[in-house]
């Protein structure tokens, strides 16, 4: 698996950077704050449901508070709204895990305020977002990728249906 990742990194670096340069594999020393714009599917696993709808999201990722070569911890703040008026606003922590320079996987978790609008009732005004995203980082430090997450009230209420979201995002440095 490591060999496949290395070969893929060499191919992408030579394709997008024009040559196999050392900078392509350099550590992520200067990780910028990011603002991310995303759109996708709300309640993605229940496409026949009336509660399945589109959504948009805005997210800001702060500077790393724990910084190692291939692992970074940073705070995030985000807001989402779906096309039925449901709203989630919250924040938490993200864990950036680097696989060569251009590829990063981010795991995240954080609580937030939820309002159902005319959408699915998730059972409680506090919902926790647990997420995973896979992204390609361009030479200018912007990112493009997919994000998947689950919103759940973590059983603070007896009603805890949760919802899954799948988004395509584009993040730019601040």
Identify the residue ranges that each predicted region occupies.
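Short loop/turn motifs that connect adjacent beta-strands in outer-membrane beta-barrel proteins
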Residues: 19-32, 63-73, 98-105, 141
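Residue-level signature of outer-membrane beta-barrel architecture
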Residues: 60-64, 95-97, 136-138, 150, ...
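Outer-membrane beta-barrel initiation region
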Residues: 20-63
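Solvent-exposed loop/turn segments connecting transmembrane beta-strands
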Residues: 44-54, 69, 79-90, 99-101, ...
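Cleavable N-terminal export/targeting peptides
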Residues: 1-30
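Transmembrane beta-strand segments that form the barrel wall of outer-membrane beta-barrel proteins
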Residues: 35-45, 70-83, 105-115, 144-152
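Membrane-embedded beta-strands that build the outer-membrane beta-barrel scaffold
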Residues: 58, 93, 105, 132-134, ...
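Outer-membrane beta-barrel "beta-signal"
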Residues: 54-58, 135, 161-174
């Amino acid at each position: 698996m490591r060999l496949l990742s290395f070969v893929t990194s060499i191919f992408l670096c030579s394709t997008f950077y024009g040559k196999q340069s050392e900078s392509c594999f350099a550590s992520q020393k200067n990780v910028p704050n990011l603002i991310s714009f995303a759109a996708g599917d709300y309640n993605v696993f229940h496409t026949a449901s009336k509660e399945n709808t589109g959504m948009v999201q805005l997210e800001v990722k702060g500077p790393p508070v724990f910084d190692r070569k291939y692992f970074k911890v940073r705070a995030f703040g985000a807001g989402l709204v779906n096309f039925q008026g449901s709203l989630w606003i919250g924040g938490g922590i993200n864990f950036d895990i680097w696989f060569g320079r251009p590829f990063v996987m981010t795991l995240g978790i954080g609580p937030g305020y939820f309002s159902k609008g005319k959408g699915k009732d998730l059972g409680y005004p506090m919902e926790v977002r647990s997420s995973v995203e896979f992204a390609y980082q361009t030479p200018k430090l912007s990112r493009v990728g997919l994000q998947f997450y689950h919103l759940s009230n973590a059983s603070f209420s007896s009603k805890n249906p949760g919802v899954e979201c799948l988004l395509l995002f584009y993040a730019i440095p601040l």
